[in-house]
Structures are given as C-alpha cells and as structure tokens.
Amino acid sequence: MLDPKFLRNELEVTAERLATRGFILDIAHLTQLEEKRKSLQVATEELQASRNAISKSIGQAKARGEDVDAIMAQVGDLGSQLDAKKIELAAVLEEVNAIAMSMPNLPDESAPIGADETENVEVRRWGTPRTFDFPIKDHIDLGEGLNGLDFKNAVKITGSRFIVMKGQVARLNRAIGQFMLDLHTTEHGYTEAYVPLLVNEASLLGTGQLPKFGEDLFHTKPATEEGQGLSLIPTAEVPLTNLVRDSIVDEDELPIKLTAHTACFRSEAGSYGKDTRGLIRQHQFDKVEMVQIVKPEDSMAALEALTGHAETVLQRLGLPYRTVILCTGDMGFGSSKTYDIEVWLPAQNTYREISSCSNMKDFQARRMQARYRVKADNKPALLHTLNGSGLAVGRTLVAILENYQNADGSITIPEVLRPYMGGLTKIG
C-alpha cells in the first residue's frame, strides 16, 4: 500500500510512475473523492463540536430551572445529522481505501522502464552451458525413464499439473530442499521456520495477494465455521512476512532473516496452455523461501545480498544461470525492484526463471502495520520487507536432471548433494 500522504501531495508524480507499470490511475476521480472526504471531514467535525457545545448548555439550563426540551431536541437533530455524515464519510473512505489497495507499488528509480519481459535487463551470467555429445532428453523423459516421475498416476489421483515422485528421484528432490535450508541457515544467517500452509485473509491482504489476486489462490471451504476463509499459501513469503504484522520490533532485533521449506499452491489462473507438460508450472510445488525484514536504509543492500544467496545455491550445484533486473511492466504487484534468476535448461535451449528476489520497501509493512522502534527518537517507523526464492525445488530438480544427464539416461549427482543421497554419485 502506498503512503497516503505522498499519494495526496504527489498525485501527478504517483500517476506517472504507476503508468510505467501499466497501471492507469484515475486522477480526476481520486481528486474528487479527496475533496469530498475533506468536505465531509470538516462537516463532521463542525457537527460534533456544535453538538458538544449545546450538550454542555443542557446542564447549565437545568441548573437555572429552565425547560431543556427544545435544547435536547436540537441535540438529537444534530446527532442525526452527524450520524448521516459519518456514514457518508465512511463510504468515501472505504472507496479510497479500495483504490489504494488495488494500486501496485511504486517502482524504484533504478528499475528499467519497460512494458514486458522482453525489456528486462540482464546484469550478469555465471557458468557455461554444457555441450553434449549425445541427443539431449528433457526432464520428463529422464524422470520417467528412471521410474521417478509419475504424471499418469498424479492425473488419476488429482488432475493435471500435479506429480508423483518415487524412488531416487523423490530422494533427490528431498535432498535439494535440505541442502538449500542448510546453506541458508549455516552460511547466510537465516533462521529456519516451520509455518502453516493455510493462512487467513488478513495475512493475504498484508502481503498483497488480496484483494487483487484471489483467483490465483486455492481457498478452503470446510464445514466448520472456525476454518472459513482460509487459503493455501502460494508462497512461504505470506506466513513468514506476516510474523511481524501488527508488531513493533526493537531496532536491535533487525535485520530479521527467515527461511522455510514448504509446499506452495497456485491455481495458475491465466496460464492456460503454458508449460502444460512437466514440472515447470505445477499447482503444487516445493520452494525454499527467504524473507528479510530490515530498516529502510538497509533494504537496497539487503536485496543485493538476498539475490546473492539465491545465486550461491546455483553456483554450489554447478548450474549455469543468468540474473536479470525486471522492467517496470514485468514486476510483481508489491515489488519496488526485482531480480529474476534464470537457470539454463538444455532441453529447452534457454534460461528459465528459478528465483525471483524482490524489495517491497514499506509497501507490505504499511498494509500489515509492521513497524520498528527507532532508537534515536523512540518512535515507531515502518519496516522494509524483502523476499526471494532460494530456490524453487522442483525447477532445481528439472535443471539437475537435464544438466547432469548421461548418455545412458542416468543422472550424475552434484557433489554438494551426495552427502544427502547416502554418498551416491549417480542414479539410474
């Protein structure tokens, strides 16, 4: 959520910056609402003051033995007018808030201006894609050949965009997640967290999935009243970031760095026809998430560090990748600046996204009322929040299967994963 004061005082600037994201702000309507809000606010305050003043005179009139019926009737009339104005004001404020909640974050000045992913800017590459001297197989053929990826039974059990993993492929998938968690907790300074996979509406509003992206979520509808309104998490960013919702954190506690390995659930609304085969785009997938909660002046440096932590995973696994900065038209709703990390997939002969690392600045914190107490003046101020995939486990499995494949269909295990695989150097 944007700063209301900045929005009111810099409406034209806000509209221009949001336009670079493809969001058209109706300045005339918002100005009209703001003028109406001011008018109703003044009228409400004046009616309140008049009623208070006349109410005080009732006691004085009674003390003088005067009839107060007329005064009481006047107070009642003012009260009715006041109630009506309050209802009008509440309606205007609700509409203003709805507009504010629908606005994406302002892009950072360092984010390149562009319309879509074709205008993202590459900032670096690591590793050299392997040259194969045999026909390359994709992860689907490799996984099925190892009897480790079972798409047929997943469709039978649930439907499309789900997977059953078995045997050494399932073990490799588990090893990938464990390696990522160990790396982030032992070397990168994150605290591991176990979080609910179901969250309430307030949590989804806080991180920005609601109200705009409800169709992307899986919502539960249990029979019990207690469970109403819960949704499966699309990312562990939601529960991890909401740990500071409605809180004031001591400055000495910052930065807060959290990581979690969870299943994630997405309806993939709007993705019809995209990546219909394989593990690239699933309704249920595992991801290791990183979240940082920091002071405002530290957030841009934290974004660089966070992105580096995700890149380190790929470097340790020996997987070639490139990092791009997203242009304004391709950034996520709540992001001010985002780096995407794309891993090399030989079977597709291209780089595909495996991590997205974003600085939300105070956008989520304002929605969540997540603050810290500044030592200098002992006053609360909004935090800055960041999040990034470290990494998407299923896509990492895809990258390992394809990049480490052998001519006979077996897969060489990356060295850093061998301790998690009981010392195995190869599967298949």
UniProtKB/Swiss-Prot annotation:
Identify the enzyme class. Answer: ligase
Read off the PROSITE patterns from this record: AA_TRNA_LIGASE_II
Q: What is its main location?
A: cytoplasm
Binding of ATP, residues:
R266, S267, E268, E353, I354, S355, S356
Pathway membership of this protein? Aminoacyl-tRNA biosynthesis; selenocysteinyl-tRNA(Sec) biosynthesis; L-seryl-tRNA(Sec) from L-serine and tRNA(Sec): step 1/1
Which keywords does the record carry?
Aminoacyl-tRNA synthetase, ATP-binding, Cytoplasm, Ligase, Nucleotide-binding, Protein biosynthesis
Biological process annotations from GO: selenocysteine biosynthetic process; seryl-tRNA aminoacylation
Which Pfam families does the protein's record reference? Answer: Seryl_tRNA_N, tRNA-synt_2b
Entry EC number(s):
6.1.1.11
Location in the cell: Cytoplasm
Q: Write down the CDD domains for this protein, in alphabetical order.
A: SerRS_core (cd00770)
Q: Show the GO cellular component annotation of the record.
A: cytoplasm
From the record, give the transmembrane residue ranges.
Answer: none
Q: Which residues form the signal peptide?
A: none
Catalyses which reaction(s): tRNA(Ser) + L-serine + ATP = L-seryl-tRNA(Ser) + AMP + diphosphate + H(+); tRNA(Sec) + L-serine + ATP = L-seryl-tRNA(Sec) + AMP + diphosphate + H(+)
* Binding residue positions for L-serine: T235, A236, E237, E289, S389
According to the UniProt entry, its GO molecular function terms are: ATP binding; serine-tRNA ligase activity
Q: Organism's domain of life?
A: Bacteria
Domain comment text? Consists of two distinct domains, a catalytic core and a N-terminal extension that is involved in tRNA binding.
Q: Which PANTHER family match?
A: SERINE--TRNA LIGASE, SERYL-TRNA SYNTHETASE
Briefly, what is this protein's role? Catalyzes the attachment of serine to tRNA(Ser). Is also able to aminoacylate tRNA(Sec) with serine, to form the misacylated tRNA L-seryl-tRNA(Sec), which will be further converted into selenocysteinyl-tRNA(Sec).
Similarity section: Belongs to the class-II aminoacyl-tRNA synthetase family. Type-1 seryl-tRNA synthetase subfamily.
Q: HAMAP family in the record, alphabetically? A: Ser_tRNA_synth_type1
Assembly behavior:
Homodimer. The tRNA molecule binds across the dimer.
User: What is the name listed in the Swiss-Prot or TrEMBL entry for this protein?
Assistant: Serine--tRNA ligase
Gene label = serS
